[in-house]
Every structure is written in structure tokens, then in C-alpha cells.
């Protein structure tokens, strides 16, 4: 006989149908959290590939302000969202990410997003879905009622933090903390092309990175870049604290 899978007695699995079906039922009567609209103005927000899947829930209230946009005469509102991700094939755990974002376009790509907090549940044991749903409801409640003033201070700290004062200096700083030279250079140049804020700032590079992530056709690659951006943003917050 050929063994195709070998698992321990603690092995468990959160199937997409069970996970997202329960999420749907949990939020069915909660108007605070909704699915984003697609190009046809129809609620959407679900993605499923051969390796992973995700569901995006958005909150139209409790906004904070991106002053790099408002100072340039643009809409600087940032909204809150929950991004739930899973992999039935075991490529990753179940993740719940708290995010702030500028907008979701019709093909459900997040623009100007930063990751605020993450929950991770491995595919171990018999209560994976139960544990995840419990965390989602807790996180959604906390995210809805969290301190707007504190969140605004976080955004302000990231927008005011300078990485360096030259292009070469910024790229060098990014390489020191794990970015490749290509990604660092591309993020800098994308910020120059698309953002009103200086690419010398952490916020400028974060926005450059999140725009780069949208170039990828694969969810895992997009998320990897977005998480790099989140780590960079958190670093600026720690420096400012």
C-alpha cells in the first residue's frame, strides 16, 4: 500500500464550507459588518483558489483619517475590516486579520490597507471552527468599539516617521530589515508615482508596498507583501511610543 498522508491523533481541519458557512450565519443579522460590493454592485468578498481561500468583511463606521491624503485635498478616510483566510490543503493555518483600508475596488482588492492585529489557529484538534468563530465574534466587537483616538495616533505616527532622507538611504534601511533591493526600490518608486506623501516616510513606503501587492495574481503573494508592510508600520509605531 502507498501512504498518501500521515497525521497525528490531534490533527484537525477547518473545511471552507464549515468555516465560511458558520461566519455567514453568525453575521447574518449584524448590519455592522458587511460584504464589499463588486463591479456589478452585488455583495461579494469571497475568494477561493486551489490552495487557499479568504473572506472579507467591512465596517463602514469608526473611521480614522489618513492626513497625507486630506492635506492634498483628497478623501483621507480609512475604514475597518476583517480578513479571514484558510487553507484546506494545509498550506497555512486559519488567520483572522484586523485591517484598516482606504477603499475596496470592484475586483475586491484592498487599497491603502494596513494590518492591525492577527489571530492564528492551527489545524489541530476537533474544535478548529468553533475556536475561530469565537475569535471572529470577539474581534469584530473589539474592532467596532475600539478607541478611535488611539488608532488615529497610530496612523499619525506612521505618516510622520522618516526612514531616511534620500532614496538610497530608504532602500538601505529597508534592506536592513529584510526587504530585497528590488522590492524596496519598487515600493519607493511606486510611492513617488501614486502617493502625495514623501517616499522618505514609513507611510509612503507602506502605501508603495500595498500597491505593489496588488500586481500579483496570487493571494498568498499579495498577503506576504501586505504583511511586510504591516511589520514596517508597526516598527514606526514602536519607535514613536
What are these regions (language model features)?
Residues 1-24, 199:
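Feature for intrinsically disordered/low-complexity regulatory segments and propeptides
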